[in-house]
């Protein structure tokens, strides 16, 4: 390898400086668990004192869920060329059921490792992979079913609770009752509850043993609704440095997991850079890379090529694989009369292979072989919906639901091997058909976590599909979907840039939070209540900081009221100083307090005073000035 830093390493270092700013008004804190090395990160939002006019009380800081890793902690020196610290390495080693290999097992991986032409784009540090010992199963589901609470399970329990016990103000704890549609929402998440949910298959904790840098998180309908962000280069756009930047950008704004969907050059090297710098689980669609290995000719794919790809990616540390094993030969003709046919890339690849060979999908016939690989590294299944509808006209048809039934069959098979599994879902579905999708998934797949792309609720808004899909995402999240895959404004139009990623994440953070509110997730409303209180008290900076995107909120406010003095003003540019509803309400309260009457009496008295004033001035609707 070259001794001097490569151009890519230099780019990575400059990126390090661009993505390490703390989120405005916040600081990173850590909540310790039962052991010294179990430190759960959260974002603490500092709040200012209520103005004397409104009571003058202190407003304690508020802790919120944080996905940004060390990138928003100014105390941590970030070097993307070195990667993140291996947070979970000791926990993995302590279990004694894995061993470090002396090299890569994948033939493709070994070939890349010894190709000097790739030195310029290779991740600098060499790391030896781990694998389960002979006969061992190292999945979190396997441990859970044996009654073991792992450090990872304790970690996510602390994380899910978000220090709600520190919120003592009853007005902030106020929350509307939810409608959970049969979900087992807990008032407090315990490590034992986490273990039970994973053991039952109702939740997954995606943590490959070769991704020790990841901060444990959980996906399940009885936990906070999560979101996924997609990144990845293509043959015509983006490079490694840009994808690493998009990773860090995604998690800064709230991406709980990230899928690398790269299909262009250097897929292997791009993925290594991403995983080594990711504090969140990374997912992939292995068939994309397998297709590259046969120069894009789907009919030339083989089980051996795909198997080698799975091992290659598992040894890099991919946490979950999208596997399109439910695209069966008999389902392909059912798509013939669809408006948009098969729109899933993975689904179309496997459909073409099935038709070319007139054989059953080799991902289906080799499914138990895949399970053997998954449980040797603790890679979770994300069973792909290769026949998802690509327009609302095709929603809930025989092809889509036939595949879903097969995914239910495969889920039960994966569970026999203690392999963690979630199910991917649509797609394009009008609002009135969304609940049918959720109900059928719960029924067919034994309550395994549902992971949906939207769904988009209308097809008429290219350029705004982050909105059309967030509508469906909020609904299906409320009905029980555990993780929502974001859609950006560029959906159907092009590869998203950094701003598109941010817009998509914001739309989906809103949808996920709205779903948590509707389900009645404990503490979900605390942040809403805190922001509403700040808004009523004209604490502008607190309003910005409590929002999902503090920078955007401040930017919009400052377009019209940029001065520091405006941060203390009792109005904004929407209504101005004389028509602010909240200022008027406060005036009514002040009048009531001064005159010793109720607010209702104050309003009545005020109306009488204004009536007398109107008559005294001549009772004319319009007066000459």
From Swiss-Prot:
Binding positions (Zn(2+)): 428, 492
Its pathway?
Answer: Cofactor biosynthesis; thiamine diphosphate biosynthesis
Q: A cellular component term (GO) from this record? A: cytosol
Necessary cofactors: [4Fe-4S] cluster
Q: Which residues bind substrate?
A: 230, 259, 288, 324, 344-346, 385-388, 424, 451
Positions of [4Fe-4S] cluster binding: 572, 575, 580
Q: Give the E.C. number(s).
A: 4.1.99.17
Q: Which GO terms describe its biological process?
A: thiamine biosynthetic process; thiamine diphosphate biosynthetic process
Q: Relay the cofactor remark from the entry.
A: Binds 1 [4Fe-4S] cluster per subunit. The cluster is coordinated with 3 cysteines and an exchangeable S-adenosyl-L-methionine.
InterPro entries per the UniProt record, alphabetical? ThiC, ThiC-associated_dom, ThiC/Bza_core_dom, ThiC/BzaA/B
Q: Indicate whether Zinc appears among the record's keywords.
A: yes
Query: Any idea which GO molecular function terms this record carries?
Result: 4 iron, 4 sulfur cluster binding; carbon-carbon lyase activity; zinc ion binding
Name the catalysed reactions.
5-amino-1-(5-phospho-beta-D-ribosyl)imidazole + S-adenosyl-L-methionine = 4-amino-2-methyl-5-(phosphooxymethyl)pyrimidine + CO + 5'-deoxyadenosine + formate + L-methionine + 3 H(+)
Function in brief: Catalyzes the synthesis of the hydroxymethylpyrimidine phosphate (HMP-P) moiety of thiamine from aminoimidazole ribotide (AIR) in a radical S-adenosyl-L-methionine (SAM)-dependent reaction.
**Protein name, UniProt field:** Phosphomethylpyrimidine synthase
Q: Which organism is it from?
A: Xanthomonas axonopodis pv. citri (strain 306)
């Amino acid at each position: 390898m070259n001794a001097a830093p490569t151009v890519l390493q230099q780019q990575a270092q400059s990126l390090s400086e661009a993505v390490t700013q703390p989120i405005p008004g916040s600081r990173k804190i850590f909540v310790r668990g039962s052991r010294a090395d179990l430190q759960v990160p959260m974002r603490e939002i500092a709040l200012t004192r209520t103005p004397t006019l409104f009571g003058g009380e202190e407003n304690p800081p508020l802790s919120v869920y944080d996905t940004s890793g060390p990138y928003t902690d100014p105390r941590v020196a970030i070097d993307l060329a070195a990667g993140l610290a291996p947070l979970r390495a000791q926990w993995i080693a302590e279990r004694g059921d894995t061993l470090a290999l002396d090299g890569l097992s994948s033939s493709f991986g070994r070939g890349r490792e010894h190709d000097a032409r790739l030195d310029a784009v290779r991740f600098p540090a060499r790391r030896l992979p781990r694998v389960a010992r002979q006969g061992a199963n190292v999945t979190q589901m396997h441990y859970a079913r044996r009654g073991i609470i792992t450090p990872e399970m304790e970690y996510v329990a602390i994380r899910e609770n978000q220090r709600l016990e520190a919120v003592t103000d009853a007005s902030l704890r106020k929350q509307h009752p939810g409608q959970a549609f049969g979900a087992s929402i807990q008032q407090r998440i315990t490590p034992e509850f986490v273990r039970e949910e994973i053991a039952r298959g109702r939740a997954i904790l995606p943590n490959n043993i070769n991704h020790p840098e990841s901060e444990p998180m959980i996906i399940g309908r009885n936990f906070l609704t999560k979101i996924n962000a997609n990144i990845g280069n293509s043959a015509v756009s983006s490079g490694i440095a840009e994808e690493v930047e998009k990773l860090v950008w995604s998690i800064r704004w709230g991406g709980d997991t990230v899928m690398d969907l790269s299909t262009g050059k250097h897929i292997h090297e791009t993925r290594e850079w991403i995983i080594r710098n990711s504090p969140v689980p990374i997912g992939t669609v292995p068939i994309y890379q397998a297709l590259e290995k046969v120069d894009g000719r789907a009919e030339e794919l083989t089980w051996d090529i795909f198997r080698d790809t799975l091992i290659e990616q598992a040894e890099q540390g991919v946490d979950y694989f999208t596997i399109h094993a439910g695209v069966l030969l008999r389902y392909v003709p059912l798509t013939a009369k669809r408006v948009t046919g098969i729109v899933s890339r993975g689904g179309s690849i496997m459909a073409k292979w099935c038709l070319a060979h007139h054989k059953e999908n080799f991902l289906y016939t080799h499914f138990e072989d895949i399970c053997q690989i998954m449980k040797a590294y603790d890679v979770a299944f994300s069973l792909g919906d290769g026949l998802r509808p690509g327009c609302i006209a095709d929603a809930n048809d025989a092809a889509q639901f036939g595949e879903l039934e097969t995914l239910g069959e495969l889920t039960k098979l994966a569970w026999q091997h203690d392999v963690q599994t979630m199910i991917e879902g649509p797609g394009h579905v009008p609002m009135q058909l969304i609940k049918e999708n959720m109900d059928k998934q719960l029924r067919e797949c034994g309550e395994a976590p549902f992971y949906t792309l939207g769904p988009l609720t209308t097809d008429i808004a290219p350029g705004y599909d982050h909105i059309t899909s967030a509508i469906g995402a909020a609904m299906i999240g409320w009905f029980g979907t555990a993780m929502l895959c974001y859609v950006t404004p560029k959906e159907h139009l092009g590869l998203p840039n950094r701003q598109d990623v941010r817009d998509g994440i914001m739309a989906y953070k809103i949808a996920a939070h709205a779903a948590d509110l509707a389900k009645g997730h404990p503490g979900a409303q605390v942040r809403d209540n805190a922001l509403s209180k700040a808004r009523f008290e004209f604490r502008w900076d607190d309003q910005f900081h409590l929002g999902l995107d503090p920078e955007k909120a401040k930017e919009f406010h400052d377009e019209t009221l940029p001065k520091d003095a405006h941060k203390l003003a009792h109005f904004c540019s929407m209504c101005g100083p004389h028509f602010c509803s909240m200022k008027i309400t406060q005036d009514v309260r002040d009048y009531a307090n001064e005159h010793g009457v109720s607010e209702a009496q104050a309003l009545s008295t005020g109306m009488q005073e204004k009536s007398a004033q109107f008559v005294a001035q001549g009772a004319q609707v319009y007066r000459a000035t």
